[in-house]
């Protein structure tokens, strides 16, 4: 089983969008049983009294436009123990990577990367600040498709 953790600042926009887009992609290809996919935050800003906030409503609406439900999701913070639990820890932008490394400490197995590293590089724009959920969705979808293609080539997930 391939275990993926998508990470952004608050775990209410980009990383849950990536989580649920990727879940849909693997499900549509009959691969859901070969993947375990979650998301987390580098910050605890969206977690109050131990309970994480749900997906930010505009992000949830953007997912719903594409037939993707994110119900039941609540923000959670990245923990050092996640490094051992997941095969890949995927940030959305360079700042996420910096903050992930502050939490994780080190990356000896080279598990930490950005989503768009699989699609030519770059950062996923943060719709929390830009209010551009269309661009964020497109970038995340492109990155997830490239990630799935990477696993298809590297791990022969279809056999």
What are the residue ranges of the model-derived segments?
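Conserved active-site segments centered on acidic
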Residues: 1-84, 149-159
């Amino acid at each position: 089983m391939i275990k993926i953790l998508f990470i952004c600042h608050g775990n209410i926009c980009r990383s849950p969008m990536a989580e649920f887009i990727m879940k849909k992609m693997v499900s549509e290809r009959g691969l859901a049983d070969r993947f375990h996919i979650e998301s987390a935050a580098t910050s605890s800003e969206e977690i109050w009294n131990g309970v994480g906030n749900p997906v930010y409503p505009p992000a949830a609406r953007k997912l719903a436009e594409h037939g993707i439900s994110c119900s039941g999701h609540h923000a959670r913070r990245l923990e050092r123990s996640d490094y051992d639990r997941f095969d890949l820890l995927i940030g959305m932008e360079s700042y996420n990577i910096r903050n992930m490394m502050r939490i994780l400490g080190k990356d000896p197995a080279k598990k930490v990367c950005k989503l768009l590293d699989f699609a030519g590089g770059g950062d996923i724009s943060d719709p929390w600040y830009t209010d551009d959920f269309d661009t964020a969705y497109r970038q995340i979808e492109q990155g997830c498709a490239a990630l799935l293609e990477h696993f298809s080539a590297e791990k022969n997930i279809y056999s």
